[in-house]
Structures are given as structure tokens and as C-alpha cells.
Curated annotation (Swiss-Prot):
Keyword Transcription: yes
Keywords: DNA-binding, Nucleus, Transcription, Transcription regulation
Ranges of Polar residues composition bias in the record: 1-12, 69-79, 304-318
One Pfam family from the record: PCC
Function field: Transcription factor that specifically binds AT-rich DNA sequences related to the nuclear matrix attachment regions (MARs).
Any one Gene Ontology cellular component term annotated for this protein: nucleus
Disulfide bridge partners, by residue number: none
InterPro entries according to UniProt: AHL15-29 (IPR014476), PPC_dom (IPR005175)
Residues annotated to bind DNA: 105-117
Residue ranges, compositional bias (Gly residues): 88-99
Protein name: AT-hook motif nuclear-localized protein 24
Gene3D superfamilies: Hypothetical protein, similar to alpha- acetolactate decarboxylase, domain 2 (3.30.1330.80)
Listed GO MF terms: minor groove of adenine-thymine-rich DNA binding
Amino acid sequence: MDPVQSHGSQSSLPPPFHARDFQLHLQQQQQEFFLHHHQQQRNQTDGDQQGGSGGNRQIKMDREETSDNIDNIANNSGSEGKDIDIHGGSGEGGGGSGGDHQMTRRPRGRPAGSKNKPKPPIIITRDSANALRTHVMEIGDGCDLVESVATFARRRQRGVCVMSGTGNVTNVTIRQPGSHPSPGSVVSLHGRFEILSLSGSFLPPPAPPTATGLSVYLAGGQGQVVGGSVVGPLLCAGPVVVMAASFSNAAYERLPLEEDEMQTPVHGGGGGGSLESPPMMGQQLQHQQQAMSGHQGLPPNLLGSVQLQQQHDQSYWSTGRPPY
């Protein structure tokens, strides 16, 4: 007969050893020991009523230490029991999960990259239609100053306002102001002259020719000063620097204003004024639209939308101006 079988038939094998049951049994024994010790100390302190203040203080300290030990054991047993349950569950359910389970704690604080990123600055790449651009124009030796600025205005399709200029010019033809009956005399100056003052404006076509003009004041070599409106070429004797500003919009206003346009609505604050009636305001708006639709009106935009007829100075104004 097999000795193993004979031994198994006589007595059963002992149950397997579990670390969990051993730890729980050890913790229970420790708790019972400390509870028994605490009960004995409490009975001794209740029976001893003749102790001094020092004895009472020592007894109180012993009580506090005992209660702290009991609380620590209870906390440790609870935390260890949780750990044992967690690991035990992972071992028992390992067939279903196939690995060890680890507790993951969510990190505190904001996740990386979640801060408010700085916004890019707002950059306006297109200028306003009413903006003025400043230009420093340098005109070379022997070039016509008037023709150079007029070509710049025509190619860029922008109005140019000449504010000042420095340099020397030669062979100037100007119209000097005359008396009231005569329009003035045209004078041709030969030689080299220094620019004292230079001003004027240039508008691209089809703007009226009267809107374009240039005035200059010159100083001669002997101290004489002459000036007037330039009616011919203005040749540069060396480099000439012109300070100018360009614009794309221009509101054309014809002065003096008509009587309907001069009437402005009165704000009724004291009770004596009266506002214009709606029919009168409608007639005024219609009159302004008719004036702008004619050949004498210059629309605000100069970029090819101007439709004006080239006229001479005598026939430009449809009606004569009233004397000032």
C-alpha cells in the first residue's frame, strides 16, 4: 500500500497558510491586550483617590498615551486591511485582468499647456481712405519739377499736396499777379535761383485743371526775390527735395453756399427755435444730390470714379460768382 495514500486515509492535510488571516489575528490580539491594559489602569486610578496633583498628572499622561496607541493601531489595521484587500483582489481576479492593478491618483493643479496663450496683436494692414501719407520726394538734376510731381499723382492715382521744397532751379516761367483788370504778366527768368517757398496741389485726371497748380518764390543771386504761379517747366539745378502729402479722398465744395445749404436746423432748447420740416430736409438732400451728379461736382473718391469734363477757366463755373 502506498504510504502517501495510507497517511491521507488516516488524517487530512492541514489547511494552507494565509498571511491575511495571520495578520488579522495578530492585530486582534494586540487590540485585546491594549484594551485589557487600559481597563486595568482605569480601575487602579478609580480606586486610588489619595494621589497628589503630580500623580494625577502622570495618570492623565498615561491615559493619553494609551488612547493614542489604540487609535494608531486602529488606523494602521484599517489601512493595512485596505491594502490587503486591494492586493488580494488583484491576485484573485488576476485571471480576468491579467496583471497587477495600481491605484492612480489624479495630479493636482492645471494640466500642462492649459494656460491662456497670449493673443497676437491686431495689425491693420490697410490704411484708411482718409489717411494722409507723407512723402519726401527727391528730384534729380535737370528734371522738370512740375512734370515729376504730376506724373507721381497720375500713376499712383492719389492727390498730392506740396508743402515745401528746398534746392535750386533754373529757367523759370511764372505768372506774376497783376492789377484787377489785367490777369497778370508772364515772365521768363534765366539763371540760377534758390527756392524760398514752394506750395501747390496736384490731382490725378479726370480732375479739373484748375485744381492743379504750383506757386513758387525764388531768390536771385543779387538778392532779388520774385514769385508767382508756375506756368511752364521748372528745371532743377541740382537735387531738389520736396515735402508733400498724398490723399485718396477729397470732398469738393463749391462756395459760396446756396441759401438752402446755409440754413441749419436750430436746436430747440429755449422754446423759441423751430426745427426744419421733413419736406424741407428732403428738398435739401435732393438738391445736394443733383449738384453732385453734375459735371461740377467732385466725388470723394479719386480712384477712377471721377467723371468731370475738362473745361477752360472761363467756362468752368456755370454761373458767375457774386462779388465779395
